[in-house]
Swiss-Prot record:
Species in which this protein is naturally found: Fervidobacterium nodosum (strain ATCC 35602 / DSM 5306 / Rt17-B1)
Keyword field contains DNA repair: yes
Function in brief: This protein is involved in the repair of mismatches in DNA. It is required for dam-dependent methyl-directed DNA mismatch repair. May act as a 'molecular matchmaker', a protein that promotes the formation of a stable complex between two or more DNA-binding proteins in an ATP-dependent manner without itself being part of a final effector complex.
Keywords attached to this entry: DNA damage, DNA repair
Protein name as it appears in the record: DNA mismatch repair protein MutL
Family membership: Belongs to the DNA mismatch repair MutL/HexB family.
Domain of life: Bacteria
Length: 588
C-alpha cells in the first residue's frame, strides 16, 4: 500500500491560501492592490476586531460583470497576463490570480460590484459559492471579509492580539497612502474615521503619517539607464531608534530589503550618530524586465538584475539631496577610490536576493539589542591590581556608619577618601549611573510639573499606542493628554515628566518607548529600558565639577546599598585596606 498520497483539493486550496493570506493586513494589502489595478481614485478601508471579524475595502474602480465575479474567485484567474513571458513585463500590482480565491477559501466573503451597467452581489463561504443576486451599486467594487480563518482554527489561534493586528493594518494603509497620493483614502477602525485623506501630494501624505518630522525634502528624480529614484527624506535631525520610518517601493510595491536600508543610511554618512535611523520614503521605478517580482508569496521581495548599481545609486542620490538642508555640511568624496570602496562594501554584504529568507523579526528591525554595550568605551580594560594586592579589591565593603569629612577629587573623575579601615577610590560617573538605575528599578524618583507643556504631533499608529500605554507612562512619572486635531492627526500634550529626565530629552524618550512597543513580533523592553538609557546618559560626566554635598550624596548611596558595578558591569570603586597598604610597603 502506498504511503505517499495525493492531497484532496480542499486541503491543497487551504495550504495555497495560507501562502498569500497570513493575517488581516495581508488581506487588506491584496484587496487595495485589486482596487488600484481597477483604476480606483477613491478607496475606503474598514476593519473590526483588528480585521479578524470584519474587513471591508470599497472603491470606485471599473468594477466587474457577473461573469467576471464568478471567475475571479477561482484560483489562477487574472486579466493581467496570458503567457509566461508576460510575468517579466508586469505593470500592475496583481498578476497571479490568487488573491480573491485565497481570501475566499478562508473566510465568509461578500463581493458587490458594478461595471456601470449591472450590479451583482456574490456570497462565498470557505471557497464555495452560496449565491449571486442582482443589486444596486454605482460603478466600482466592495469586498467584505467576515471571520477570517473561521475554517482553519489553528491559523486563527495564532493571529496576534486585536491591538497588534490593528496596528499592522494601519501601517499597510499608510504605505498605500504614501505610494498613491493621487488616490483619496478613508480608513476606519470600527466606526471611527482614522484617516480621511483627499487627493494630495507626497509631502502632504508624509506630513500626515510622520507629523513629528518638521524638516524634509523631496528627492529630485534621478534617471539612469535602468531605473529612476525619487521620494522624500528627513533631515539628519529627525531619526528613530529603528528603521520603521524607512519605506521602500519598487514599481510602487512595498518591499523589504535590508541592503536598501543600508544604502539609504550610507548616504547620510557621518551626519548620523550610532543607532540613529532617518526617515525616508523611496521610490525605485524599473523597466519591468530589469526586476523579478515573482519570488515571494506576498511580493514583498524583488530581485534586481544589477543590485550593486541600485544600492550605490541610492546612496549617491541621498547625498545629493542632503545638500538642500542649509545646516547640513558633509564632505562628499569624489575620489574614485572612495566610490570603489563603498561599492565593494555593499557587494560583500550577502548580495543574494534569491537566497534571502524573510522572517518576522526582519519586518521591523529592532535596534535595541544591547543598551549598555554601546556605552562601554572601546579602550576600557578591567582594573588590574598590583601583583601583591588581592583580586578582592574589586569587591569592596564600605563602612556604612559614617560619611567622610574630607575627600579629594582627582582629574575631575575620581573621588578619593579615607574609610575606617582603608583608602577608597570611586569613579563618580559610573557610580551616578548606578544610583540612577537603582532609582528607576525601585520607582523612587520625583516628578516635575512643566510650566510649558510639551506638544508632540503623532500619526494614528502612535496615537493608538499612546492611549494603550497611558498607565505604563504614569507609572514612571509622565502625565499627558491626547488631543485630536482638526486635520485628523493628533498630538500628545505632556504636562509632567520624571525628574531624572531632562526636559529636552522627554519628547525623544516618549517616542522611543512608542517605537519599542510598535514592533509586533518582539516583546518590548519597555519604558524602564529607554528611561535607563537616557538617565544614564544624563549622569554626571568626567570633567563635571561636583559640590561637596553632591559628593557626599554619591558616597552615601554607594555605602547604603553596597553598589559594586555600574549598569554596564564596570567597577564603581576600589578599596585598599590599611593592611594591604602596609603589606605593599613591607611594613608588616
Amino acid at each position: 500500500m502506498s504511503v505517499i498520497k495525493k492531497l484532496p483539493q480542499e486541503v491543497v486550496s487551504k495550504i495555497a491560501a495560507g501562502e498569500v493570506v497570513i493575517n488581516p493586513a495581508s488581506v487588506v494589502k491584496e484587496l487595495v492592490e485589486n482596487s488600484l489595478d481597477a483604476n480606483a481614485t477613491s478607496i475606503e478601508v474598514q476593519i473590526r476586531n483588528g480585521g479578524k471579524s470584519y474587513i471591508k475595502v470599497s472603491d470606485n474602480g471599473i468594477g466587474m460583470s457577473r461573469d467576471d465575479m464568478l471567475i475571479a474567485i477561482d484560483r489562477f484567474t487574472t486579466s493581467k497576463i496570458s503567457a509566461l513571458e508576460d510575468i517579466y513585463n508586469i505593470h500592475s500590482y496583481g498578476f497571479r490570480g490568487e488573491a480573491l480565491s485565497s481570501i475566499a477559501e478562508v473566510s465568509r466573503l461578500i463581493i458587490t460590484s458594478s461595471d456601470g451597467n449591472n450590479a451583482h452581489r456574490l456570497e462565498v463561504i470557505g471557497g464555495k459559492i452560496i449565491k449571486i443576486t442582482e443589486t444596486h451599486r454605482e460603478r466600482g467594487t466592495t469586498v467584505e471579509v467576515y471571520d477570517l480563518f473561521f475554517n482553519i482554527p489553528a491559523r486563527r489561534k495564532f493571529l496576534s492580539s486585536e491591538k497588534v493586528e490593528t496596528r499592522m493594518v494601519t501601517e499597510i494603509v499608510e504605505k498605500f497612502m504614501l505610494v498613491q497620493p493621487s488616490v483619496s483614502f478613508v480608513f476606519k477602525i470600527e466606526d471611527e474615521i482614522v484617516y480621511n485623506a483627499s487627493k494630495g501630494s507626497l509631502e502632504d501624505r508624509f506630513s500626515i503619517i510622520f507629523p513629528e518630522v518638521k524638516e524634509f525634502s523631496l528627492i529630485e528624480p534621478l534617471q539612469s539607464e535602468i531605473m529612476q529614484i525619487s521620494g522624500i527624506i528627513s533631515s539628519p535631525q529627525y531619526t528613530r531608534r529603528n528603521r520603521s520610518g524607512q519605506i521602500f517601493f519598487v514599481n510602487k510595491r512595498f518591499v523589504i530589503d535590508n541592503l536598501l536600508n543600508l544604502s539609504f543610511e550610507r548616504g547620510y554618512g557621518e551626519a548620523l550618530a550610532q543607532g540613529e535611523h532617518p526617515y525616508g520614503v523611496i521610490f525605485l521605478d524599473f523597466l519591468p524586465d530589469k526586476i523579478d517580482v515573482n519570488i515571494h508569496p506576498q511580493k514583498l521581495q524583488v530581485k534586481f538584475s544589477d543590485p550593486q548599481n541600485v544600492y550605490n545609486e541610492i546612496a549617491r542620490t541621498i547625498r545629493t539631496t542632503l545638500r538642500k538642508f542649509s545646516f547640513f555640511q558633509m564632505s562628499i568624496s569624489k575620489n574614485s577610490e572612495e566610490e570603489e570602496k563603498y561599492s565593494s562594501e555593499i557587494s560583500n554584504q550577502n548580495l543574494k536576493a534569491e537566497n534571502y529568507q524573510h522572517t518576522d523579526s526582519e519586518w521591523y528591525p529592532n535596534q535595541f539589542k544591547n543598551l549598555y554595550q554601546k556605552e562601554t568605551p572601546q579602550t576600557y580594560r578591567p582594573y588590574e591590581p598590583l601583583s601583591s594586592i588581592s583580586q578582592n579589591l574589586l569587591l569592596p565593603q564600605l563602612n556604612e556608619k559614617s560619611l567622610p569629612k574630607e575627600f579629594i577629587v582627582l582629574k575631575d573623575r575620581y573621588i578619593v577618601f579615607e574609610d575606617l579601615d582603608g583608602l577608597v577610590i570611586i569613579d563618580f560617573h559610573a557610580a551616578h549611573e548606578r544610583i540612577i538605575y537603582e532609582q528607576l528599578k525601585e520607582n523612587k524618583f520625583e516628578t516635575v510639573q512643566l510650566l510649558i507643556p510639551l506638544h508632540i504631533k503623532l500619526g494614528k499608529s502612535f496615537l493608538q499606542l499612546s492611549q494603550q500605554l497611558t498607565d505604563e507612562f504614569k507609572k514612571y512619572g509622565f502625565d499627558f493628554e491626547i488631543k485630536t486635531l482638526e486635520d485628523g492627526s493628533g498630538e500628545v500634550v505632556i504636562k509632567q515628566i520624571p525628574s531624572i529626565l531632562k526636559v529636552t530629552d522627554a519628547s525623544n524618550v516618549f517616542l522611543e518607548v512608542l517605537e519599542e512597543y510598535r514592533i509586533p513580533f518582539e516583546k518590548p523592553k519597555g519604558l524602564t529600558y529607554v528611561l535607563a538609557s537616557k538617565a544614564c546618559k544624563s549622569a554626571v560626566k568626567t570633567g563635571d565639577k561636583l559640590s561637596h554635598d553632591e559628593v557626599q550624596q554619591i558616597i552615601k548611596e554607594i555605602k547604603s546599598k553596597n553598589l559594586l558595578t555600574c549598569p554596564h558591569g564596570r567597577p564603581i570603586m576600589m578599596k585598599l585596606s590599611f593592611s594591604q597598604l602596609d603589606s605593599f610597603f613591607e611594613r608588616i
